[in-house]
């Protein structure tokens, strides 16, 4: 996280690549260390990779509240729309999700179910640039922001940039730094 911040990034993501959430206290300690490393000027984004159940998601959301996260991404499995909506409504966290969804219908269930604050269509999964623009329009109607997910290399990132440049509810572009 410190390396990303040192290169001028406005946000740094944290994800479980090595089972850090297998031990909740270890995961929380790592997030606290990330926040300390990047300070308060750089946003901290946390990707949970759909690994929690509702009680654990709510517990972790409460525990990380002092860290002032930019978003709390995909804490629950994607098919649990009502549970995701509960986290969105009651956790005090800004929630994000949808990086592996395909097509407007899947995104629409999340938007109308109020399952997230921020949709994250990925051009390579969602159905291309045009479909991502349609998804963003659908989200805008429901006052949901869009943060294109683009961590699969430069072509994917540039496709995400094209989407971002053409939608009024664009928030942030997620991309893999240094990969």
Predicted regions, residues:
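Shared catalytic-loop signature of beta/alpha-barrel
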Residues: 62, 68, 77-179
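Metal-dependent enolase-superfamily TIM-barrel catalytic cores that perform enediolate-based chemistry
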Residues: 1-85, 90-91
């Amino acid at each position: 996280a410190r390396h990303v911040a040192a290169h001028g990034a406005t946000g740094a993501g944290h994800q479980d690549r090595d089972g850090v959430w297998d031990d909740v206290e270890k995961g929380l300690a790592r997030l606290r260390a990330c926040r300390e490393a990047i300070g308060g000027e750089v946003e901290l984004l946390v990707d949970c990779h759909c690994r929690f159940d509702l009680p654990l998601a709510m517990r972790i959301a409460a525990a990380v509240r002092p860290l002032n996260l930019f978003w709390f991404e995909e804490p629950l499995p994607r098919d649990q729309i009502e549970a995701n909506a509960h986290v969105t409504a009651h956790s005090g966290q800004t929630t994000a999700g949808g990086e592996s969804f395909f097509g407007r219908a899947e995104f629409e269930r999340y938007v109308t179910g109020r399952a997230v604050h921020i949709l994250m269509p990925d051009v390579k999964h969602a159905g291309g640039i045009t479909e991502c623009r349609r998804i963003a329009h659908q989200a805008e109607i429901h006052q949901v922001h869009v943060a294109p997910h683009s961590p699969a290399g430069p072509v994917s990132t540039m496709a995400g940039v094209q989407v971002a440049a053409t939608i009024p509810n664009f928030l942030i572009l997620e991309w893999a730094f240094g990969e």
